[in-house]
Design a protein with these regions (language model features):
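Contiguous alpha-helical segments
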Residues: 1-83
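Intrinsic structural disorder
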Residues: 58, 124-125
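Short Cys/His-rich local motifs and their 1-3 flanking residues in nucleic-acid-associated proteins
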Residues: 117
């Protein structure tokens, strides 16, 4: 287990697609569980595109200061790091169909970590 954790930590630093794949799988699984539903199908089917296409899509929405090196970083300051954010929060889902639609790639955006964690949270802004 220690080896696996160290391996994944190192791979996250060197292979951004590996990092995206892990984070998106966890993000989608957790959002479905929070609404008391079960994940049915593969992550890419729910997402609506491959992980490579998702990476390209997110990069097309980057602000000038965003890159994969500052993804997930947070120190309480604006424009320090960014998170993957659901544009329409999954907490607003009222049904299984809605939660699946809200996990489509087109409902994701890169958002400043400060804005996402302090201002937006589970709100639509």
């Amino acid at each position: 287990r220690v080896y696996r954790n160290e391996y994944e930590k190192n791979r996250n630093k060197t292979d951004k697609l590996f990092l995206i794949r892990r984070r998106i799988k966890n993000c989608i699984s957790n959002s479905i569980k929070r609404t008391n539903h079960r994940k049915k199908g593969k992550t890419v089917e729910i997402l609506g595109c491959s992980f490579e296409e998702f990476k390209t899509y997110i990069e097309s929405k980057f602000e000038s200061w965003m890159n994969w090196e500052n993804y997930g970083l947070y120190n309480g300051e604006l424009n320090y790091g960014w998170d993957l954010d659901h544009i329409i929060p999954t907490a607003s889902a009222k049904s299984e169909v809605e939660i699946m639609l809200l996990n489509k790639f087109t409902n994701f955006q890169p958002l400043c970590s400060y804005v996402n964690r302090v201002i937006k949270k589970d709100k639509l802004i």
